[in-house]
């Protein structure tokens, strides 16, 4: 499963189309995004909702809550899939190694602690 934010992070510096809920579209290169899916585009072509007006802008900032959908190149989707698979493989390797479990892990020996913490007092 690919999370939308990881897809957006990978799509930085790639072209994308952003359609808003009101029908307007922004075509440009993704410069940055945040956890609310607010998007900063550069080299943007804005198209009005009826499609008869076009504006070229050096940059645009789109609020995440107004976005209807994003169109991202297939190559970016493939990049994300390979990154996700690599992270999974790395996590499996770490789990199979075993960390701190079994003999000799954290916590030390649970036997008699010598003169520490016993009842009675000093002799």
Swiss-Prot record:
Where found? Nucleus
Chain positions covered by the region annotation Disordered: 85-123
User: What's in the keyword line of the UniProt record?
Assistant: mRNA processing, mRNA splicing, Nucleus, Ribonucleoprotein, RNA-binding, Spliceosome
Composition bias of kind Basic and acidic residues appears in: 85-97
Q: Name one GO molecular function term.
A: U6 snRNA binding
- Say if the entry is tagged with keyword Transferase: no
SUPFAM superfamilies, per the entry:
Sm-like ribonucleoproteins
For biological process, the GO terms are: mRNA splicing, via spliceosome; nuclear-transcribed mRNA catabolic process; P-body assembly; spliceosomal snRNP assembly
Task: State the GO CC annotations.
Answer: cytoplasm; nucleus; P-body; spliceosomal tri-snRNP complex; U2-type precatalytic spliceosome; U4/U6 x U5 tri-snRNP complex; U6 snRNP
Instruction: Give all residue intervals belonging to the Sm domain.
Output: 3-76
What's its job? Plays a role in pre-mRNA splicing as component of the U4/U6-U5 tri-snRNP complex that is involved in spliceosome assembly, and as component of the precatalytic spliceosome (spliceosome B complex). The heptameric LSM2-8 complex binds specifically to the 3'-terminal U-tract of U6 snRNA.
In the record, the note on similarity to other proteins reads:
Belongs to the snRNP Sm proteins family.
Q: What is this protein called?
A: Probable U6 snRNA-associated Sm-like protein LSm4
Q: Supply the source organism's classification.
A: Eukaryota, Metazoa, Ecdysozoa, Nematoda, Chromadorea
């Amino acid at each position: 499963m690919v999370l939308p934010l990881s897809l957006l992070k990978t799509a930085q510096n790639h072209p994308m189309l952003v359609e808003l809920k009101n029908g307007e579209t922004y075509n440009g290169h993704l410069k940055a995004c945040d956890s609310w899916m607010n998007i900063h585009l550069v080299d943007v072509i804005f198209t009005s909702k009826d499609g008869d007006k076009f504006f070229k802008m050096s940059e645009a900032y789109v609020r995440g809550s107004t976005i209807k959908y994003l169109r991202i190149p297939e190559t970016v989707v493939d990049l994300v899939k390979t990154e996700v698979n690599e992270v999974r493989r790395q996590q499996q390797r770490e789990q199979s190694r075993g960390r701190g479990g079994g003999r000799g892990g954290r916590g030390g020996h649970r036997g008699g602690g010598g003169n520490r913490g016993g009842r009675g007092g000093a002799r």
